């Protein structure tokens, strides 16, 4: 297993707002040839949620945003976002699937709140960008499938 973000600068990022957030960034580019070569050689790339600015500053990146950017860049068929809950919950039950329209409705109803909002928002954007499915779930890979 190789950690690539620190060694080969696989991820280029832009500062979100240096004065407000400090060294926090958003993905601007993924060096896909390095990742594709590893995958072609049956290797599993492991990326830290770190990117580098054009000036060489190391920037923290939200892990879900990085994962979705990599999935889009690699034209992945599926992305699994691991979390500490079994999936998107409604009344304590895991939803089997969720569309972008249902996502907004459930936010408006107060069903989806807090840290799950940016996770699902990035998942919805990933599906809309062409990744076939995003699964949000726990280490047992039960979960909620985000579909278009």
Task: Give the residues covered by each predicted segment.
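C-terminal catalytic "cap/lid" subdomain
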Residues: 1-148
